[in-house]
Amino acid sequence: KCMGTWIDISQRLDDNVAVWPGDTPFSYKVNWSKEECGSVNVGQINMSIHTGTHIDAPFHFDDDGKRVIDLDIELYMGNARVIHLPNKTSIGVDELSSIDLQGVTRLLIRTDAWKDRSVFPQTIPHIQPELAAYLSELGVRLIGLDLPSVDPLDSKELSAHHELADHGIHILEGLVLDDIGPGNYELAALPLPLVEADGSPVRAVLKKLH
């Protein structure tokens, strides 16, 4: 059973949101104003897909990988487990082996490693590639983090991205889990129906479960 109300775990999108160094900064502007045309305000958004809270499609790191429109939409809705792993330099089997994850399909990891989301971090606790096989065997199909990537920020190989995809695990990044306690929740974090895209912004929300 669900308890209480939905909790927004998405980054707010405005000029203060951090972007990958060299990537497109977020901007919103009104192209047609009600004052000028007498009817409506019509805005335009310009942003990188990998800004704020977003999902990665395999095409992001694999030219032959699935695009957003090809992803199983049900993976982004349903029961999720939130766990806390603060003060880690990386996250692997050793960090998770003492946590019971049987029956968990969607795993959200709160690291508390990215405090000021108006500034892109210098380093993050990345996912160790061998964790993918371990999580897959447990039945995990979606991993979410309060970080901009699952790999080291200077990685060119993106080994964790590839291993997760090879084991059927989808990636959700940039969550805001600061006030979320460990436990079981209902998650909704739906990507847009982007036909050619390598990722999508999402509005991620949680509701506590009994």
Please identify what each model-predicted range represents.
Residues K1-H210:
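Active-/binding-site microenvironments in catalytic and ligand-binding cores
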